[in-house]
Amino acid sequence: MEIYDIIIIGGGPAGISAGIYAVSRGKNVVVIEKEKVGGLIGSVSTVTHYAGIMEGETGSTFAARLEKQEKNAGVSIVYETVQKVSLKGEYKTVVTDKGTYQAQKVILANGTTPRKLGIPGEDELVGRGIGRNAAGEGANFSGKHIYVVGGADGAVKEALYLAQFAE
């Protein structure tokens, strides 16, 4: 088993930034990401409140730029689901669904996940009437009534984006 200097849990903006910086300082790093580089921000219609964002940039283009920078920097990334973390001892251990990793340091950059409504049948209807990615799924709802459930400016921003498709 290879022992890393740093294990980073999460491939969103924070995790990728930490990985790029650590590699630039000569550290042996692995980023563990369960789905895709960019995390949740990769699914938003327009990215705001991040340094270096191009005006009107979508979440998917931002995530693609993160992935390109991560690859160009030589950051190692694996797509696995973390199941257990032990931070005891000199070497920390991270167990995933595909293997075990050890490092002197662990950075938690695990981000966020969309909140569920908690209504019966919600999980079964994702992709068949319930969407969680306005930028990627909005056109699928063209000419239909669209309801947005969420809080703060993020929900308003997505509702404004989806208005172009709604009845």
What are these regions (language model features)?
Residues 71-78, 108, 164-167:
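Generic secondary-structure signature for well-ordered alpha-helical cores
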Residues 12, 37, 46, 81, ...:
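A generic "binding-loop/recognition-motif" signal
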Residues 3-4, 8-34, 126, 133-167:
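Rossmann-like dinucleotide/flavin-binding elements
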Residues 39, 117, 157:
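Alpha-helical elements of the RecA-like P-loop NTPase motor core of helicases
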Residues 1-9, 25, 76-144:
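FAD-binding core/adjacent interface of flavoenzyme oxidoreductases
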